[in-house]
Structures are given as structure tokens and as C-alpha cells.
Amino acid sequence: MINFNVGAWRPTTGQARAARLASANDLVTRTLAQHGLTSGSGTASSHGDGSETMRSALSGLMARLQPDGGPATPPADIPAGAAFAEDAFTCAAGTRRYHTYVPASAREGITGLVVMLHGCTQTPEDFAVGTGMNALAEQHRFVVVYPQQSRGDNAQSCWNWFSRGDQMRDRGEPAILAGLTREVIARHAIPADKVFVAGLSAGAAMAVILGGAYPDLFHAVGAHSGLPAGAAKDVTSAFSAMAGREAGSAPRDTPTRTIVFHGDADATVHPSNGAAIVRQALEGGPAQSLQTDAERAAGGRSYRLSTTYDADGAEAVEHWLIEGLGHAWSGGQPAGSYTDPKGPDASAEMVRFFFSPSS
């Protein structure tokens, strides 16, 4: 028999109250851990105010912005004449390290720059391997930059797309990433109109923020399994946005050239977020536009491709919805984490979209 009166409320003194509060915080932490929202340590905050539990929950929330995958993968062999160097950028908003890949083919002339923002728990090396972007850089003679999120700023190495202080121009992480990009542009004399940004998951959400905040700097965006800018302002709204419920969106005055990839089997970030990115990217554009839809297949997966054209007939936005794909980089390399080798090659299609003659 269960005695429901055992837990009846009774007045407590300071020591007993503190013990109960610690026990409650411990229960919250362990419950969040069961749902993948914390590190699972089960240790409550010694401060007794729940702040550490909330910070742990926040880090765990961002950890959900990644597919199931293995540990980070070391970088692939660098071709003779190429360079994959580490550096750091500092401004008033903070410091971030980054890797720059300069292909051996750059000696024939650099065609542009692609900034690649990794997903949660990933590293620049791992992301480079998984997306295969360095090989495409060799083929097309562009430079690739892989900024690295600091674990001091997010315990799971996630970009803080949901934070109010990291969603606007000249503030927080957008300011750091924009400044970092400008530094690389100047160092390698990169054509100013051939600078693009792409990312996976939390990285995709930050890429979308950058595209809207710095249209003068980033001339197209690639978003894989991400969310629209302004989808969340705090932890609670981030949960809702990821689940496809009550997602917000920051209004825009000008359209942003964007290519979106999302799997229809994504259980981490609901596919409706991909459609929301598309709608946001088209804001500020003409009231009427031409859109085409096609059902196709590549790499063993079917997909639906919706393309919206601008007034000049150029591709303004592409939306790839891939059947059976979870929360992983489509057509990615199995040596990297959080990739699915099946399906269309997201990296190749992004590069094609970025460097198309009409861009």
C-alpha cells in the first residue's frame, strides 16, 4: 500500500529546507538528464538557487541540436601546397579560435570564401571531414573558414542562437563572427561579393542570423537542419521552436539568398523550421515570385526541391526536404560525425548555389 500522507507538507527549518531544495534540484537535474538535456551528473547546485541546474539544462538543450553520432574525427590529410591553419580573433564582444583552409589551387586565384559553422559538440576539424568542404574548395579555389565555439561560452560547443545577446548586428557572437570573417577577407584578398556562410543545426541557426544581420557581408546562406532567426529568445521558447511549436521569427526588410536542407525524419529540429527559414529569407522581396517544385532522388533518397526565383530569374531560395533523413548532414562523409552518406550532397549543392553565375 502507498501512504500518500508520507509526503504531506509540514513547516521546516533552514537546514531541512536547504536539504529538500537540494534534493529537488537533484531530481530536476536527473530528470533533464534522462531526456538528454544535461550532462547527467545528477549533482545539484551548491548555491541552492537552481542556477547551475538551469545552466546545465541550457547546455543540454543545445546538445539536442545535434544528431546521434560518434566522437570527433581528426582532420584528413592536407594536399601538398594547401594549408589548414589555426588562428584566433578578438574584438570587444569576445574571442574565438578558427581554422582556415586555403587550397593548393588558390595559387591560380581565390574565387571566394565560405564560413562553416559546426553543430553542437563538433570541432572545426570534424566538421571539415564530415562535410567534405575542403575537397570542394580545392576543386573551386575558394577559402573555407571554420570558427570554433568556446566551451567557456557554451558547455556543448553550440552557437548561442537562442540568446537575445547573440542575435543582432554588432553584438555577441554575430559581432565576433563578422569581425573574424572580415579579417580573413583582408588577409587573403577575397572578392567582397563572394562571401557566404553555412552551418549545421545550431550552426545553421547562427548562419541564418548572420545572413540577416550582415547582408552587406554575407551574400548567401546555407542552412542545414536549422531554425529561423528570432525563433527563440530563451530556453523555454527554444524548446518550442525545436519542436515546431510557436516558433518566432525576426522580421526582415530585404530578402536573403538562402539554400535550406532539412530531413523529414528530423526528430531534433522539426522540419517546419526549414520552411520557416524559407519564408523569412523571402521577406522584403517582391510580393509575387515564381516558384517551382520537383520530386527527385539522389544517393538513395527521394527529396522535394522547391525553388523560388527573383525578378531576374535567378534562384533566390532553394528548399530541399529529404525523405527519411534525420538530423544529419545529407550526403556527408562517414568519417565525420553527424553525417548521413545517403541522399543528395548538401555540400556540393551549397557550393553550386553560392557560386552560381547569377549570385
Language-model segments: residues:
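Short beta-strand/loop motif that positions the catalytic acidic residue
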Residues: 260-262, 266
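Alpha/beta-hydrolase active-site loop
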Residues: 165-188, 209
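A domain-start/cap signature at the N-terminus of enzymes
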Residues: 1-113, 125-126, 131, 198, ...
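Conserved alpha/beta-hydrolase "acid-adjacent" motif
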Residues: 268-273, 330
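Short substrate-entry loop that stabilizes the transition state in hydrolases
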Residues: 106-155, 230-231
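The conserved beta1-alpha1 loop
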Residues: 115-121, 225, 262, 323
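Primarily recognizes the serine-hydrolase "nucleophile elbow" in alpha/beta-hydrolase
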Residues: 185-187, 192-254, 267
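Cap/lid segment of the alpha/beta-hydrolase catalytic domain
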Residues: 148-172
